[in-house]
C-alpha cells in the first residue's frame, strides 16, 4: 500500500461516519448493557460513538445493536463489545432486560436458538487449529447485518476481496444466502479475536463507505411473526418442536460442509430417499460463495407430523455419524 493510499484510508477511517448493526440474542444484549446500563455507557464514552440496542419485544428472541461514529471509533467500539461478550462476569438485576442472575451468561456462544439466524454457522476452532489455549479463549463470533449491496462489495469479484480480508486479518467470515425476514439484509458472520475483528471491520466499513451508495434496501427489525409467516424453526439437538397455527413442525440439522455431498448423495438420491421414507420436506441451504469445509450448512426439516420430523432428524444425524466413522476408518487404513 502506497503512502497516499495509507493517508487516504486514515482520513476515511477517522472522518467518515458509518453505522454498524449487529444481530444479538437476548442474553448477549443483556450482557452488553450491563447492570443499569453501565457497560454500554462505558463503550459509548470510551469510543465517542452513538450506540444503543433496540427495544426488547415480547415473544421476540433477538435485538439489534446500532453503533454510529467514525470508522475507527465504531470498529473499536465493536471490539470492546466482543470483549464484554467474552468476559465471564454474570449479569444481575438488569433493569432493561429483566434477566435474572444466571450462569448461562458464561456460555452464550454454546447456546442453541429457536430463531435460526441467531445460530452461528462457523464452528469454534479446536486447540489443534489455533495451537494456543489462551488465544482460543479469545476467539468470538459476531453477526454483522449488511444489505445486499454491501455484502456484494465485501465479497468482491469472484470472492477475491473477502479472501483477502480473511487472509490479511486472520479472521474467518461467511455470508448468509438468505435475507432476514421482511428485509433486504443478510448476515455476515465474523470469527476471530477482538483485535482481529476490529481491524477487519475497519477494512469492511472503508469499502462500504467508498463503494456502496445509499440504497432503499429494507433494514431488518426484530418483530413477532404474523400468523401467515413461516413457523419458528427448532434448532435444539434434542428436538422439541415448534408448532404453528396450521400444525406445521420444523427442525434444523447442521451438517459440516465437508459432509454435505455424502449426505445428499449422487444426484440427490440419498436425501430424496430420506424425504420419501420420513414423509418430510427437507430444504437444504444453498452453498455460500466463500465457505470452508468446517463451516456448516442448514438442513431444514418440515412436516405436519412431529414424529416424521423426529424420524428425519434422527436419520440425518445417523447418516452423518456413519459417514464420519467411514472416513476415519479409511484414514486409519491408509496410514497403516
From Swiss-Prot:
One of its GO terms (biological process) is mRNA transport. Keywords: Chromatin regulator, Chromosome, Cytoplasm, mRNA transport, Nucleus, Repeat, RNA-binding, Telomere, Translation regulation, Transport. The keyword Nucleus applies. It comes from the Eukaryota. One of its GO terms (molecular function) is RNA binding. Residues 17-81, 139-204, 248-316 form the KH domain. It is found in: Cytoplasm; Cytoplasm, P-body; Nucleus; Chromosome, Telomere. GO terms for cellular component: chromosome, telomeric region; nucleus; P-body. InterPro entries: KH_dom, KH_dom_type_1, KH_dom_type_1_sf. Belongs to the HEK2 family. Binds RNA. RNA-binding protein involved in the correct localization of transcripts in the cell. RNA localization is a widespread mechanism for achieving localized protein synthesis. Involved in structural and functional organization of telomeric chromatin and regulates silencing at the HMR locus. This is Heterogeneous nuclear rnp K-like protein 2.
Amino acid at each position: 500500500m502506497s503512502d497516499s493510499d495509507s493517508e487516504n484510508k486514515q482520513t476515511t477511517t477517522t472522518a467518515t461516519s458509518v453505522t454498524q448493526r449487529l444481530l444479538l440474542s437476548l442474553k448477549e444484549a443483556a450482557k452488553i448493557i450491563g447492570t443499569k446500563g453501565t457497560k454500554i455507557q462505558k463503550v459509548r464514552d470510551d469510543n465517542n460513538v452513538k450506540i444503543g440496542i433496540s427495544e426488547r419485544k415480547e415473544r421476540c428472541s433477538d435485538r439489534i445493536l446500532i453503533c454510529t461514529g467514525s470508522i475507527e471509533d465504531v470498529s473499536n467500539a465493536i471490539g470492546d463489545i466482543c470483549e464484554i461478550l467474552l468476559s465471564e462476569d454474570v449479569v444481575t438485576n438488569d433493569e432493561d432486560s429483566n434477566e435474572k442472575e444466571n450462569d448461562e451468561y458464561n456460555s452464550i456462544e454454546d447456546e442453541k436458538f429457536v430463531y435460526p439466524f441467531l445460530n452461528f454457522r462457523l464452528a469454534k476452532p479446536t486447540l489443534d487449529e489455533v495451537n494456543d489455549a489462551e488465544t482460543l479463549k479469545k476467539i468470538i463470533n459476531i453477526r454483522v447485518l449488511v444489505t445486499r449491496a454491501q455484502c456484494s462489495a465485501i465479497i468482491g469479484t469472484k470472492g477475491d476481496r473477502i479472501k483477502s480480508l480473511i487472509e490479511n486479518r486472520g479472521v474467518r467470515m461467511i455470508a448468509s444466502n438468505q435475507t432476514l425476514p421482511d428485509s433486504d439484509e443478510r448476515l455476515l458472520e465474523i470469527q476471530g479475536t477482538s483485535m482481529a475483528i476490529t481491524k477487519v471491520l475497519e477494512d469492511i466499513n472503508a469499502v462500504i463507505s467508498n463503494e456502496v451508495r445509499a440504497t432503499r434496501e429494507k433494514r431488518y427489525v426484530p418483530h413477532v411473526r404474523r400468523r401467515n409467516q413461516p413457523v419458528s424453526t427448532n434448532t435444539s439437538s434434542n428436538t422439541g418442536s415448534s408448532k404453528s397455527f396450521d400444525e406445521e413442525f420444523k427442525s434444523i440439522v447442521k451438517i459440516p460442509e465437508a459432509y454435505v455431498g455424502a449426505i445428499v448423495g449422487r444426484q440427490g438420491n440419498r436425501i430424496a430417499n430420506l424425504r420419501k421414507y420420513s414423509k418430510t420436506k427437507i430444504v437444504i441451504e444453498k452453498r455460500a460463495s466463500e465457505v470452508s469445509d468446517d463451516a456448516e450448512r442448514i438442513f431444514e426439516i418440515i412436516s405436519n407430523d412431529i414424529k416424521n420430523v423426529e424420524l428425519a432428524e434422527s436419520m440425518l444425524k445417523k447418516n452423518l455419524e456413519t459417514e464420519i466413522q467411514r472416513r476415519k476408518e479409511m484414514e486409519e487404513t491408509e496410514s497403516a
